[in-house]
Amino acid sequence: MIELIRYLSVNPVLVFLPIALVFAIFLRTGSAPERLARALFLFPFGIGRLAACARVFFFYEETNSLLGLDPEHFQYKIGLADLGLGIASLLAFRKSFSFCLGTAVFAFIFLGGIWIGRLLNFLAGLSPVESFWTLGAKSFLLLLLAASLIFWHRKKAGKA
């Protein structure tokens, strides 16, 4: 079980992006950018963040060694933020554009903070290369989400 949770949370692009793309094709409502945004909220940002939360809460020793960190109480704050983002993303899957946009802002702020922290740790030699790979994957997912929301809004504005 730990290997599955570890793989899901460390490789979000490899695992969840193909699932999200296939799922977006089979969604029947909305434009293509809307379907892509909803699928991204459901899989990498919803289920992926819940897997990251489970890893932080239940497998903290393995998580800390993977990231090169000492065990500390701060990890539980990260786990709660992962839980919040995961739940908000699952809700965004079925909610309005405004709710999706608010959830995307939450994702950008939270994951952007993680990105900056890991980059600084990596540059200081405190984090292994594996944790740096996840930054690129998360950055790609954030850019894909931003693009899908922009095109969703443009399509929506064109219909009004």
Where are the model-predicted features located?
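Individual transmembrane alpha-helices with interfacial aromatic-anchor signatures
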Residues: R6-S9, E130-L142
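Hydrophobic alpha-helical membrane segments
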Residues: A81-L85, T103-L119, S139-L145
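Membrane-interface helix-boundary motifs at transmembrane edges
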Residues: L27-F41, R94-C100, S127-P128, G158-K159
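Core segments of alpha-helical transmembrane spans in multipass integral membrane proteins
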Residues: F43-F57, H73-L90
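Short juxtamembrane and helix-loop transition motifs at transmembrane-helix boundaries
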Residues: E3-R6, A37-F41, E61-P71
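Membrane-helix boundary connector in multi-pass membrane proteins
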Residues: F93-T103, W115-W133
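Hydrophobic transmembrane alpha-helical segments in integral membrane proteins
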Residues: M1-L21
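Membrane-water interface at the C-terminal end of transmembrane alpha helices
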Residues: V22-I25, S89-A92, L142-A160
